[in-house]
Amino acid sequence: MRSWAGDATTRLRAVSAPQFRTDLHLADRVLDLSRPVLMGIVNANPDSFSDPGHRSLEVQLDQVRSMVAEGAGIVDVGGQSAITDVAEIDPAEETDRVLPLVEAIRAELPDVVISVDTYKPVVARAVLAAGAHIVNDVSGLRAPELAPLVAEYRAALVVMHTAAPPKVRLQASDLYDDVVADVRDFLSAKVTEAIAAGVGKRSILIDPGPDFTKTPAQTVEVLRRLRDLNPSGLPVLLALSRKDFIGALTQTRPTDRLAGTLAAVAAVGSGSGVVLRVHDVGEVRNFLTVLEALTATDPVDADLRLTDDLRWAT
């Protein structure tokens, strides 16, 4: 692996994270995105690389409680893994996995914004009827019924770039003539489609789809040029956490990619108009807290102190 320092002609660029529109309109509220909002990942499936194995509803709900306490403003509930070598499940089974958790969150934590990671209209209708606020569609609106359904419930929609159907692994260095232009044009067309179906423009987030039908180099190029692929300045969902492009750069497994995740957050995910989809809510929150303190111009509270119980043991 190349030395992190590079060669003598290489210099670190000044980090200036992109800034995008700072309001996201949901059916019952407007979400303030003037600072990055953390979306905690909650897997209601046994196939996820981060949370393998069956977990009871109470265990899942306890994870939601912990993420909210750590600073998550949104929880993203998923019932089907995006892993390509795991078979797709039918909509009824996916609904059975996610609906009880959505209902439990709404009942116990009504202030929490609920996103559901699905591209299936049957699942989306069930969770929207139960009170979910956002449909996180990783298919790029392949189901024509999905956008009108989101509009019917006045919910928000995540439009993600991908060049293949769900569960299809496609990575090739020559797949795109210009990956940034292709992602920009795809997202622009899909946003237009969603608006035509009745979804409010202020209820749409775009997702450049890191790793989805992109090589690590293509993902890095897309993230470097995030401003270029979002000329309208729509809010952006960034799913950077533990991604394969980070693993390729650092040659690490998913569970060892926190440092790389934080570096990606600093570079492209620390500005306004951003939702960060993350596994490690507390760590990302702490990182952003320190980053903001060190880069802001506002004075730090003069009375700020560390409590004795948090000091190094003597």
Question: For each predicted feature, which ranges?
Answer:
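Active-site-adjacent loop and "lid" segments of alpha/beta metabolic enzymes
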Residues: 2-8, 17-19, 26, 33, ...
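Catalytic domains of carbohydrate-active enzymes, especially glycoside hydrolases
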Residues: 62-78, 271
